[in-house]
Amino acid sequence: MVVNIKDIAHYGRWFPFYKRDYDLWWFDKEKCQMIDAEKMGITFDCDVHSLHNVISQCDGNYVACFRVDIPALEMEYARIYLSKEEADYLFKLPPKDMDREFQRIIEQEALVGRWYRYELARLSVAAEQWCKDNHIPYKV
């Protein structure tokens, strides 16, 4: 089976300010699909915090999803497409507030579509590299 990069790209969205100590998504190489951590915990009869330890003892069929730091990506985008004043303003905010303000600014500036295309492109690159690193057949 071959995974379509566009089908998995959005699973890599990661917000470090939520401070989770576990992966939200896992890829089942056999079924060629993403599975959320809660379902994985049920499958392996463990809590989500123990998944890495439990799965590391398996046959390598499950792979933790890639992560793209979305607030960092938003700042990268802001430095390229927003005014210097807006980017400087965002940079001074705590990450959670910055994310909210970034969304407000791109909506106000009518840049939402451009942002989502930019984000998808970066997520797709990360997904493709993750597939290569984990020997997962893919198509773009």
Regions found by a protein language model. Name each.
Residues 1-57:
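Extended, charge-biased low-complexity segments
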Residues 22, 60, 122, 126:
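Short, well-structured alpha-helical interface segments that form or flank functional binding sites
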Residues 33-90:
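Aromatic-anchored, charged helix-turn/loop surface patch used as a conserved interaction hotspot
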Residues 114-140:
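Acidic, proline/glycine-rich low-complexity IDRs
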